[in-house]
Amino acid sequence: MTTPEIRGVYPGSFDPPTIAHVAIAEAAVRAGALDRLDLAISRIAFGKDTARQAPAEVRGALVERLAATRPWLHVVVTDAQLIAEIAAGYDVVVMGADKWAQVRDPAWYDSVEQRDAALATLARVLVVPRPGFDVAGADVLDVPAHLAGVSSSAARAGRTELIAPECRPER
C-alpha cells in the first residue's frame, strides 16, 4: 500500500521569483514533510496592481526554471484569486504573515461567518513571520531573518541580486 502524496501550495505573484521565495519553498517542504509543492500564480492577483505586473504566463515560465532543478516543485497558473479557493484540495498552504493577516481580516469578507467558513476550509497553514504581523493560528516557518527585506518590488526596481539565480536576466 502506498502512502498518499502530501501536497502543498504556495500562492504568489512571483514577479519575479526571489531568493526569499526559494528559501520559503524549501522551508515549507521541510516543515510540512511535503512530497510536492505547487507555486500557484493567479492570472489576476487579488489586491495587486496588475498594470505593472508581468503576464501570468511570463511569470509561470520564470518559475518553471526553479522547478526544473527541484523535482518536488511544480507550477500552476490559476484563475482563482482567494487563498481558500487556491488551497482547495491541498494538505498545506504557505503564505507570508501579511497575507495571513489579510485572510483572517473580516473586512475582506461579507461577514465574520463567511470569513470563518473560508478559514475552516484551509488545511495546515505555514506562515512566514514578518515584523508587525500576528501569526496566531498558523505554524511558523523557519526562514533566515536576513531574507525578510527581500521583495519582488525591489528586484523589479533593479536589485537583481534578489532574483532567484535561475531567473536572473542574462547579462
Where are each of the predicted segments found?
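Nucleotidyltransferase catalytic core that binds NTPs
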Residues: 1-171
